[in-house]
Amino acid sequence: MTEQHETIQSVTDGIYNNLVTSMIHSIVSKETAREKLLRSRYGSYKQYHYDPNSQLDIHGNPKQQDSSQYFYCENCGREVSGNRFAAHLQRCLTRGSRR
């Protein structure tokens, strides 16, 4: 009886292992095909840079202060600081519509 029990156990283990292995192979092949499709559409992606000191941006470049960036206002022709650009546009556009 024990030999028959061991044989049944080994057969069931083999069937179970084959099922699990085929499921894993199926999942891996589907995900590999999906990954290849995504890479062919969008190319490979570049990892973002992580700086624990917050001195660099996500691309690894030194951070710039908003006040050091200036933008050109198309409406009035002035250069405006980046941290004041939204407020300037609101004033500039409402002032221009009153004239």
Curated annotation (Swiss-Prot):
Q: Has the keyword Cell membrane been applied to this entry? A: no
Zinc finger boundaries on the chain: SGF11-type: 71-92
Q: Name one GO molecular function term.
A: zinc ion binding
Q: Which family is it part of? A: Belongs to the SGF11 family.
Function of the protein: Functions as a component of the transcription regulatory histone acetylation (HAT) complex SAGA. At the promoters, SAGA is required for recruitment of the basal transcription machinery. It influences RNA polymerase II transcriptional activity through different activities such as TBP interaction and promoter selectivity, interaction with transcription activators, and chromatin modification through histone acetylation and deubiquitination. SAGA acetylates nucleosomal histone H3 to some extent (to form H3K9ac, H3K14ac, H3K18ac and H3K23ac).
The record's note on its domains? The long N-terminal helix forms part of the 'assembly lobe' of the SAGA deubiquitination module. The C-terminal SGF11-type zinc-finger domain together with the C-terminal catalytic domain of UBP8 forms the 'catalytic lobe' of the SAGA deubiquitination module.
Protein name in the entry = SAGA-associated factor 11
Organism equals Candida glabrata (strain ATCC 2001 / BCRC 20586 / JCM 3761 / NBRC 0622 / NRRL Y-65 / CBS 138)
